[in-house]
Regions:
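Extracellular glycoside hydrolase catalytic/binding regions
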Residues: 161, 177-383
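The substrate-binding groove and active-site-proximal loops of carbohydrate-active enzymes
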Residues: 16-30, 70-94, 130-148, 174-193, ...
Length: 418
């Protein structure tokens, strides 16, 4: 597919994810969409990537006229990136989507449509109706349901004369790590998921044959790239290299539910004084359903909520030297492998997220000298292989502290633009 000539030669992408509708309360970063876009343009961005909540707005049959996004309940999750939702905002879902696109038009920006709905978006709902509606869809049909919802969403934008702001459409975010894989057998979810995704892409193309559509993948699934549907119009990957962060996660069994959680070591090495035990840190009873609606596990929420950010950062810095070369090599290898797949398939390449991994809200490892060096290295490599678009960093967005590092974002976006 030939991309529309009105789209930018390079997409400089800021990751607004679901935050553009969860963080709209007084004083929150998306209370004023014009200001958010103005700040993005000042930093060198021309594109934002969002969860457009397509299933909720166009597939669920739920009333979306008065959405009141919520956090995970009380203080639970309030020191986690993306989950520190203040609450207090109320939006008309479809009207807010239209306002986002109108603001994008005013600031000459573009939007990548996506969905996080089978990962965590419904955990921010006022109640569990959104989550239950998603889970009621047969797993074999979920990509097709998303395709229909996104097609309806685009029809809505066409009616309002705003569809030229769409850069491209993703059926879903990080598909192999989402509930799109429910019921699949085998270890290789990338390969096993391909038939479902192919049906979803085909369904979207039936509705909008001249609009680019794709899916995206966590990391770069080297060894499983045969599972990426050949019908995608854009190759999209998220090269999170982790490295030393993987060592931290493994040391304390933060994501490995098959091992006992390292309560005392994590308390001794990472947590703030007075932290409760993991078993005692839960959402209020009325909010516990939210843990079903997000793919982030209780251990990770607990450690992010209760870690001392300085101790977390120090733990990583103390061990980084042992991982530096491997992390740099992985980044380069993944970017080259992604570029090779895209070139072989004749489609443009985009890195929609990156580059190290998921760190606590107030941690600065990815924003500090190590992380900034990875941002520079990643955008240089992205430019070298001819990527159509990339982020500076997943954390370079209005909902994160890194937004204040204007100089780094301008520098990296200038490299991406060439």
């Amino acid at each position: 597919m030939t991309l529309s000539p009105h789209l930018p030669d390079k997409l400089t992408i800021s990751l607004w994810d679901f935050s553009w509708y969860t963080r709209t309360g007084p004083g929150e970063p998306f209370a004023d969409l014009d200001r958010a876009f103005e700040e993005a343009v000042t930093r060198g961005y021309n594109t934002v990537r969002i969860c457009a909540m397509p299933f909720l707005l166009f597939g669920s049959r739920l009333d979306t006229g008065k959405l009141r996004p919520s956090g995970l309940g009380g203080a639970y999750g309030q020191r986690m990136r993306w989950y520190d939702v203040g609450g207090g905002g109320e939006i008309d879902g479809r009207a807010w989507l239209r306002e986002l696109f109108e603001a994008a038009l005013r600031h000459d920006c573009f939007v990548i449509l996506s969905s996080w709905e089978y990962q965590q978006s419904p955990s921010f709902g006022e109640d569990r109706a959104w989550f239950d509606a998603l889970m009621a869809v047969d797993p074999e049909r979920r990509p097709e349901a998303l395709a229909d919802a996104l097609a309806d969403l685009i029809d809505f934008l066409v009616i309002h004369g705003l569809d030229d702001r769409i850069a491209f459409t993703e059926l879903h975010n990080e598909v192999q790590g989402s509930r799109l894989t429910d019921g699949l057998e085998g270890q290789d979810k990338v390969v096993a998921l391909r038939p479902r995704l192919e049906r979803g892409i085909a369904r979207f193309k039936e509705r909008h044959p001249n609009r680019p559509v794709t899916v995206n993948y966590a990391k770069v699934p080297v060894g499983s790239l045969r599972g990426v549907p050949r019908e995608v119009d854009v190759a999209v990957f998220h090269p999170y290299v982790y490295g030393v962060l993987d060592e931290l996660l493994a040391t304390f069994a933060i994501r490995d539910r098959g091992r006992p959680f390292a309560q005392e070591p994590v308390r001794r090495e990472l947590l703030r004084p007075g932290a409760p035990d993991l078993a005692d840190w839960t959402p209020p009873p009325g909010d516990r359903w939210r843990l079903e609606a997000t793919t982030v596990g209780p251990r990770e929420i607990y450690v992010h909520d209760w870690c001392d950010p300085d101790r977390w950062d120090a733990w990583l810095y103390d061990r980084y030297a042992m991982h530096r070369l491997a992390m740099e090599q992985r980044l380069t290898t993944w970017i080259e492998a992604a570029a090779d797949w895209a070139a072989g398939s004749g489609v443009p390449l985009v890195f929609g997220e990156g580059w190290i991994g998921y760190t606590p809200l107030h941690g600065t490892f990815e924003e500090g000298p190590v992380g900034a060096a990875f941002c520079r290295r990643a955008v240089e490599e992205s430019a070298r292989v001819g990527a159509w678009g990339a982020v500076v960093c997943s954390n370079a967005a209005p909902q994160h502290p890194m937004w204040q590092d204007i100089a780094l974002q301008r520098e990296c976006n200038a490299v991406l633009r060439g």
